[in-house]
Amino acid sequence: MRGNARGPRPNVANPGKLLLRLLSYIFKNYGFACIIVVICLFITVFSSVQGTLFMQTLIDDYIIPLTKQASPDFTELAHAIGRVAIFYACGVLASFAQSKIMVYVTQGTLRNLRNDMFIHMEGLPIRYFDTHPHGDIMSTYTNDIDTLRQMISQSIPQVLNSAVTIVSVLGAMIVLNIPLTIITLFMVGVMLYATKVVGGASAKYFIAQQRDIATVNGYIEEMMNGQKVVKVFTHEEESIADFNKLNDQLFESADNANKFGNILMPINAQLGNVSYVLVALVGGILALEGAGGFTLGKLASFLTFNKSFSQPINQLSMQINNIVMALAGSERIFNLLDEKPETDDGYVTLVRAKKENGQITECSERTGMWAWKHVHQADGSVDYIELKGDVVFDDVDFGYNPDKMVLHNVDLFATPGQKIAFVGSTGAGKTTITNLINRFYDIQDGKIRYDGININKIKKDDLRHSLGIVLQDTHLFTATVMENIRYGKLDATDEEVIAAAKLANADTFIHQLPDGYNTLLTGDGANLSQGQRQLLAIARAAIADPPVLILDEATSSIDTRTEKIVQDGMDKLMRGRTTFVIAHRLSTVRNSDCIMVLEQGRIIERGNHEQLMEEHGKYYQLYTGNLAE
């Protein structure tokens, strides 16, 4: 079970480089839209600055002179206000357009990221999914993507707006009065220092919060998948205790992150008020004395700029939290995208074929015959080798980690039509051998040949297309029964689907479902029994009509009565095909042509049932022990 050990707080590596990569990704797909957003942003800021500068003109050139006139004429004032109103209207329209375009850019970027992530994930090797918690991967698609949504739609536009506003307002303040500008800049420096201290303290906790959320999601998924085991062993209290530890860890990181993050804006707001008071005090004295031509109108404009100058600083400090969280999420997203995809240096492909006058040729029509198309790299000549299902392991060594071998000197051969069974205790290497046939993993030493061809030369998609597999853990997709069976051969007709179901003896129970073959399965087929789910998996393998079958404990979860029904169909399916079977019930492999007994990654016995029983070795012990049960 998981403990509550806490390591050092994680940090985002190269945040600047990460931010640049994210911005490049956005601009690559929506560059023109981003340019329009920046233009709209400049128009918005320009209209705001012009409106503030007009305040000086309004007071000094219109209001004060008009108060001194006996019969004031407001015509020129009305014209001036009209011109400013046009500026403000342009700013409002630009701000509206900016918001609309950013929604489009944000949602489009997230859609592209999800697409890129999923496409890339589908190309990753099985090793990645064996070594990364599925909850962590799911958190990347949900929580991390959501933090990016906030950053792209809110933080980035706000940061740009604030930056342009700061530069524009600073220029206007310098023009109005340099001493007051120096006071304002000094207070801004104090605010930036506060932002650095408080923001730096919160950043590490926001990063940890993202990691802790992924950990909690992973644990919840783990417990959901293992609920039966939890209840059988009455481990509810232990699982709750472990969850509470992880949840408390998440609470601690989230509490610390928001504790620091939430005080940053109030601190800067109060410092902004101090700046405003200082400027008002000094500026009032300058205006009353008329020093340097400083007027009440200029003071009014400067005070507004002072607030406008501190406001973007506050907004920047507020967005720091979102940016840090988003960078932590984007780091995980780009880590997924940077994972090396499954390599495939094979060049031998599987093609439809026909045989005429003893010669195998490639064709496009369905003939029921397949062949390996071997284009020799040396001279470009082409050989066609009939797909039969001849599999040979030649002195194979393999380890999931190179420094720890799990298979040693494995030699085996299976000719077309043979049924090869692997037996042995858990962890002996039975399933590993089938993983190597699929090239889910590549061997460290030795050779595996398929119809005389080294499987490293065969393209992985074509290799796997030639194999029918029933995995130990049956997985059904959210689709109809017919679509789940058709997954083994996407262009199969309805008649072929039904024929495969009959072969697997699944047709009877399918007709008993509410909508028969059109019954929608959800939740991994949760409304079906384990035996029914396994029958559908066998039908899925049957429809592929492969020359080689891999049955990884295909009947180990089926009751005895169902097993007999399945076995009858499987015997028909296996006829004429090379079949590798792994089963704990040794009675299901008695009729195998060859039984191989594995122990600690080595084949220690081989032969048919009668031969192995006569040897009184490991197989004899397993078999008699099985009967004794």
What is each residue range found by the language model?
Residues S24, F32-T57, A80, V84, ...:
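Alpha-helical segments in transporter systems
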Residues N29, A33-F46, Q154-A208, V279-F294, ...:
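Transmembrane helices of ABC transporter permease
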Residues P65, A172-F186, N256, F260-E331, ...:
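Helix-loop-helix
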Residues I126-R127, I145-I152, I156, L160, ...:
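An intracellular "coupling" helix at the cytosolic face of ABC transporter transmembrane type-1 domains
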